[in-house]
Curated annotation (Swiss-Prot):
InterPro entries: G6P_Isomerase, G6P_Isomerase_C, Phosphoglucose_isomerase_CS, SIS_dom_sf, SIS_PGI_1, SIS_PGI_2. Its main location: cytoplasm. Keywords: Cytoplasm, Gluconeogenesis, Glycolysis, Isomerase. This is Glucose-6-phosphate isomerase. PANTHER family: GLUCOSE-6-PHOSPHATE ISOMERASE (PTHR11469:SF1). Belongs to the GPI family. CDD domains: SIS_PGI_1, SIS_PGI_2. GO terms for biological process: gluconeogenesis; glucose 6-phosphate metabolic process; glycolytic process. Pathway: Carbohydrate biosynthesis; gluconeogenesis; Carbohydrate degradation; glycolysis; D-glyceraldehyde 3-phosphate and glycerone phosphate from D-glucose: step 2/4. Its EC number is 5.3.1.9. It catalyses: alpha-D-glucose 6-phosphate = beta-D-fructose 6-phosphate. GO terms for cellular component: cytosol.
Length: 535
């Protein structure tokens, strides 16, 4: 495989020379109906990717296919899955796909022995998680006072919180409808003491199980919250070691610690933001909904992973989505992307994608540490529809910057409690707004009053399925993970480290240790941090 910068590719120069089509012409003109029918492809597990409202045409799609070939995007994806050392900065493999590979013999047989061993390790840990969850649900594991556990709290931050929390919220309604709710579930992430205090104030402390998630075992915020919770439990006359579970690595200070009821392990080959399908997400979600639900989620993710191996970009939704995103960011210069799920269940999904995308591809040097001159990962933001329509859509429609949009929608609601009101159901109203927004952003509107004129030409895509189920959620998560990795390959980035996270953390440690001077001291003095207690 060859690793080269994007601007060294012949297809890149070709894309720069092609004039982008007008959406008013290609989508809203006489060929629009046929375009809507054709510009769509499967993404796995019933999920579909629709790109008719993107500013691409046959010429651009051909050039994007050439770029995919020139940058060997699928070959690099296959190499990653086979255990190549893709994380160059930290000299590590990238193996989160193995956590949802299951026991597919044909898939495993082609993998190197070392990778098969890692798959066996991940599978063993997942089986331990399932056994532990069944023990809790069936009453085999109880509190120190003999009561069954009723609630579970995940304590973690970053990838140990954003992904698992987003997935839990996404499945909560589905689980209620299908009577799959096993335990009430909560999350603590911020080191802000009000976060933990507020969550704990609403809990039956005696019957709550706490999951501490830190791969390194040294995460400041997570360890601080653990001690906060332990303090509150002791004040209530409870013993913390009878109510804590750890999720960490086998080399962390938390490993094999008798102060935890159980410990479950991951490794350095699974990055935090890619860890939702590992034990990082499995423990809390299996306790919340049971092993079968999480198993269906994994199967949906595995199906999307297999779809991402397709060479033809028009049959590979993640690859096509990635290439169009590279075209919009680097060729057209669009700086942002809005993720707009028309499902309240996905309320926190944009926040997870924000970390997944911006921490992966928010880089200004290539995978060899050499500065690059072209634009890379966009700023990601989003909010569920129709809430966002009453918030920031004004800017999206009439602002001076074009923001590509990624809509997500489902034909049916999760709970099914949807009476006809004023001639239509709530779900019909929701979906009518999705359709209206796609066309409105593309077509715009002319008016004699400039203040009421909409320029249109605002590109969007649509990911949709019949319903948000565990399988479609797994495919949705894997689609974005694979999309972001493909983009990193195209830009020649290392999408699996996060050096930008470290600088501020290091300075904060100096401040708390009183090792400050100059402007750092001046800002610290605003909060009287020089006189903060140290123990």
């Amino acid at each position: 495989m060859n690793w080269r910068n994007l601007d060294e590719c012949a297809a890149y120069a070709r894309l720069q020379a092609i004039r982008a089509p007008s959406l008013k012409t290609v989508l809203c003109g006489p060929e629009g109906i046929e375009r809507v029918r054709r510009y769509c492809t499967d993404a796995g597990a019933g999920l579909r990717y629709h790109y008719a409202a993107k500013t691409v045409n046959e010429e651009i799609l051909t050039a994007l296919a050439a770029l995919a070939d020139e940058q060997e995007l699928v070959a690099k994806y296959d190499a990653l899955r086979a255990g190549a050392q893709i994380n160059t900065g930290e000299k590590r493999k990238v193996l989160h796909h193995l956590t949802r590979l299951g026991v597919q013999g044909s898939s495993l047989a082609s993998l190197p022995c070392e990778v098969r061993d890692m798959h066996a390790f991940y599978t063993k840990e997942y089986e331990r998680v399932c056994a532990f969850a069944r023990q809790v649900h069936e009453g085999g594991l109880r509190t120190s006072r003999g009561a069954p556990f009723t609630d579970v709290v995940q304590i973690g931050i970053g990838g140990s919180d954003l992904g698992p929390r987003a997935l839990y919220l996404a499945l909560e309604g589905w689980a209620q409808r299908h009577q799959a709710v096993k335990m009430r579930t909560h999350f603590i992430s911020n080191v802000d003491p009000d976060d933990a205090a507020l969550v704990l104030s609403k809990l039956p402390l005696e019957t709550t199980l706490f999951i501490l998630v830190s791969k390194s075992g040294t995460t400041l915020e997570t360890l601080s919250n653990e001690l906060f919770v332990a303090h509150v439990l002791r004040q209530a006359g409870l013993e913390p070691h009878t109510q804590f579970v750890a999720v960490t690595s086998e080399t962390s200070p938390l490993a094999n610690n008798p102060q935890y009821l159980a410990s479950f392990y991951m490794d350095d080959f699974i990055g935090g933001r890619y860890s939702s399908s590992s034990v990082c997400g499995a423990v809390v979600l299996t306790l919340a909904f049971g092993p079968q639900v999480f198993g269906h989620f994994l199967s949906g993710a595995a199906e999307a992973d297999r779809a991402a191996q397709e060479q033809d970009i028009r049959r590979n939704a993640a690859l096509l989505d990635a290439l169009i995103g590279v075209y919009e960011r680097t060729i057209l210069g669009y700086e942002h992307t809005a993720v707009l799920p028309y499902s309240q269940a996905l309320a926190r999904f944009p926040a997870h994608l924000q970390q997944l995308d911006m921490e992966s591809n928010g880089k200004s040097v290539n995978r060899f540490g050499i500065p690059i001159t072209y634009k890379t990962g966009p700023v990601i933001f989003g909010e569920p529809g129709t809430n966002g329509q009453h918030s920031f859509y004004q800017h999206l429609h009439q602002g001076t910057s074009v923001v590509p949009l990624q809509f997500i929608a489902f034909q049916h609601s999760q709970l099914g409690q949807d009476p006809i009101i004023r001639g239509s159901t709530g779900q019909q109203k929701l979906l009518a707004n999705v359709v209206a927004q796609i066309v409105a952003f593309a077509r715009g509107k002319e008016h004699a009053d400039a203040n009421k004129t909409f320029s249109g030409e605002r590109p969007s895509s649509l990911l949709y399925a019949k319903a948000l189920t565990p399988q479609t959620l797994g495919a949705l998560l894997a689609h974005f993970e694979n999309k972001i990795m493909f983009q990193g390959f195209a830009w020649n980035l290392n999408s699996f480290d996060q050096e930008g996270v470290q600088l501020g953390k290091t300075l904060a440690q100096h401040i708390l240790a009183g090792e400050v001077e100059g402007v750092l001291r001046a800002y610290a003095d605003l909060f009287d941090l020089a006189h903060a207690p140290t123990c």
